[in-house]
């Protein structure tokens, strides 16, 4: 039951992000997608205005597995710095339960993964960006809130709600 509940929560979070993508399309914003699971983080979709490509990549995004959070935050910082050089401030949304358990060197360790993730979060917080951490855990987790606080971002526990309700919460939390 917990596995199917987690998949349902991920589906609702993806639905909310899809609604957010539609808003970005209307404003002609660029969007990018970074997946972080198992051994590494990967830029699946470089910054683009293509809503169709973004939706396809989001739909195919799997959940579960190990979490190389630091590497994902490093990629996010790199994109934020590039955006800053172009005179823009990047906004990002992170869907996570906050359980960083892969260190930068690839070691599977919750302690090292968390330490590396928080160090990467401190660096990202200094970039021209603003962020939102959506806690996808069944129950709100202190580690996801700590990540949001370190990022100087907004924390939002995934409510038991549909994508529309979550999208309204995201809109309220992001500029």
Give the label of every model feature segment.
Residues 72-80, 92-107, 111:
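N-terminal-biased segments
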Residues 147-175:
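C-terminal helix of von Willebrand factor
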Residues 1-47, 71-75, 88-95, 131-140:
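Von Willebrand factor
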């Amino acid at each position: 039951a917990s596995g199917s509940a987690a998949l349902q929560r991920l589906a609702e979070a993806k639905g909310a992000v899809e609604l957010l993508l539609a808003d970005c399309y209307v404003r002609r914003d660029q969007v990018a997608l970074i997946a972080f699971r198992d051994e590494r983080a990967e830029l699946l979709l470089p910054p683009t205005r293509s809503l169709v490509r973004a939706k396809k990549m989001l739909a195919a995004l799997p959940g579960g597995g190990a979490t190389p959070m630091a590497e994902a935050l490093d990629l996010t910082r790199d994109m934020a710095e590039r955006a800053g050089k172009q005179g823009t401030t990047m906004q990002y949304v992170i869907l996570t339960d906050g359980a960083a358990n892969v260190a930068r060197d690839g070691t599977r360790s919750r302690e090292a993964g968390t330490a590396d993730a928080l160090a990467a979060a401190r660096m990202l917080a200094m970039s021209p960006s603003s962020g939102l951490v959506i806690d996808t855990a069944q129950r709100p987790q202190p580690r996801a809130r700590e990540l949001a606080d370190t990022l100087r971002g907004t924390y939002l526990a995934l409510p038991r709600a549909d994508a529309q309700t979550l999208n309204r919460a995201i809109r309220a939390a992001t500029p």
